[in-house]
Amino acid sequence: MAAKEVKFQTDARERMLRGVDVLANAVKVTLGPKGRNVVIDKSFGAPRITKDGVSVAKEIELEDKFENMGAQMLREVASRTNDLAGDGTTTATVLAQAIVREGAKAVASGMNPMDLKRGIDLAVDAVVKELKNNARKISKNSEIAQVGTISANGDTEIGRYLAEAMEKVGNEGVITVEEAKTAETELEVVEGMQFDRGYLSPYFITNQDKMRVELEDPYILIHEKKLSNLQAMLPVLEAVVQSGKPLLIIAEDVEGEALATLVVNKLRGGLKVAAVKAPGFGDRRKAMLEDIAILTGGTVVSEDLGIKLESVTLDMLGRAKKVSIEKENTTIIDGAGSKADIEGRTAQIRAQIEETTSDYDREKLQERLAKLAGGVAVIRVGGSTEVEVKEKKDRVDDALHATRAAVEEGILPGGGVALLRAVKALDGLKTANNDQRVGVDLVRRAIEAPVRQIAENAGAEGSIIVGKLREKTEFSYGWNAQTNEYGDLYAMGVIDPAKVVRTALQDAASVAGLLVTTEAMIAEKPKKEAAPALPAGGGMDF
């Protein structure tokens, strides 16, 4: 076991504080509408330019082990806020740095660290309650666009696309962000349920220009096993032919004789038909077939349920207004399933999302929910260079999370003002002793840090801005760093999601409280590298 180095009390806290400052100072330059960029060197490819706090934090690794511990603890604040709210990482970092600094001063002057932490926790709970009481529910599309614009660092185009996407697919819908092949940013919305399986034979194609199969008002047969001959299906096929409607077959696979028979029937014009493979694998495939059945009002033909292919009748087939099949995906539009059944299924999937501990499973369940509840929107981010596209994509991701958070818990005045106003909740707060009171006051001072930093990044004097804001008591009265104006921030469109502000404060206080109560630090001693031995003389005669 390698030898360890141990640091205590002031020495430990000083080193840790140095690490905290290095990381926070690199991250906080990105805060606010006039925040600057950070350039990150990459071992391969072009350097990365970003204004995303968590991306900067994740890149920082310090040589001194003790300083690095402080930096990594602070990085945890940014990562946690990013995981929970998806934005507000820079605000959380700035708050954590301010609380740690104030806390370290208090501990150095002889205060009890545990009581300080209790005071910090009391203050944070009171401020969070005040924030929740003042949060305003988001209703209008324009407000969603404003939240998106602010999180994308003032890019109105991104805000507009996000608002449009959320309007089209709903709050439950999946919105994905991809890199575009062109210089333009564009939005594509897939309405209905889409899954990534295409036609099994190009002979099924009905629209030669677009190379796709289009079936209007088709019947849909959902079968979980392979189909290798059609003998068992003949009764239902005859019934479909008599109805004059097209047929879509979704099965594990359609092969050999079965596929050949379907193709021949299609080419002769006897039956408008297309076949696709079922999406997913294993248990997920069963669940997705059940989703399709509920969406289309059909029944899954499954031996588990005791349903044989021979006994399938027309009323067991699903229906949809339209089905469009391309080489690699199938879209079912306007399924005929009952609204109550679809709502029941979405409630069941939501419950599974709550229970699951796996991020992968959660993502897949959310995709299934979106396909049932709304649709899928894809924002393709374009730019002139790869570096620009990556930087813009970071901002779109932030903005997407922020708009979701805003819909979830409402909005607050932006620019750090909500925290500044919520401080009044600390006025009547009762504490058990003086050290806890110092912990509360410490949060009162630290909470000004985001406003001060936004002002500093915009080239203004933080203390003057804070002083002017304190003169007015209205909750939404603040300073717009973009235009250098004072007024109602809601009216100016300077708003933050309540969830982002709340999460930033709670995560910052949580990690800062741990740092303040740290009394000893242990790290591996750096190994002393032995000087390389000189090569032996080669016995040369002169």
Swiss-Prot record:
Annotated InterPro entries: Chaperonin_Cpn60_CS, Cpn60/GroEL, Cpn60/GroEL/TCP-1, GroEL-like_apical_dom_sf, GROEL-like_equatorial_sf, TCP-1-like_intermed_sf
Function: Together with its co-chaperonin GroES, plays an essential role in assisting protein folding. The GroEL-GroES system forms a nano-cage that allows encapsulation of the non-native substrate proteins and provides a physical environment optimized to promote and accelerate protein folding.
GO biological process: protein refolding
Subunit structure comment from the entry: Forms a cylinder of 14 subunits composed of two heptameric rings stacked back-to-back. Interacts with the co-chaperonin GroES.
Top-rank lineage group of the source organism: Bacteria
Entry's family note: Belongs to the chaperonin (HSP60) family.
A Pfam family of this chain: Cpn60_TCP1
Keywords: ATP-binding, Chaperone, Cytoplasm, Isomerase, Nucleotide-binding, Plasmid, Stress response
The keyword Chaperone belongs to this UniProt entry's keyword annotation: yes
PANTHER family tied to this protein: 60 KDA HEAT SHOCK PROTEIN, MITOCHONDRIAL
Enzyme Commission designation: 5.6.1.7
Enzyme class name: isomerase
The encoding gene: groEL5
Induction details: By heat shock.
Coiled coil regions in record: none
Protein name according to UniProt: Chaperonin GroEL 5
Listed GO MF terms: ATP binding; ATP-dependent protein folding chaperone; isomerase activity; unfolded protein binding
Principal location: cytoplasm
Catalytic activity, as annotated: ATP + H2O + a folded polypeptide = ADP + phosphate + an unfolded polypeptide
Binding site for ATP: 30-33, 51, 87-91, 415, 496
Species for this entry: Rhizobium meliloti (strain 1021)
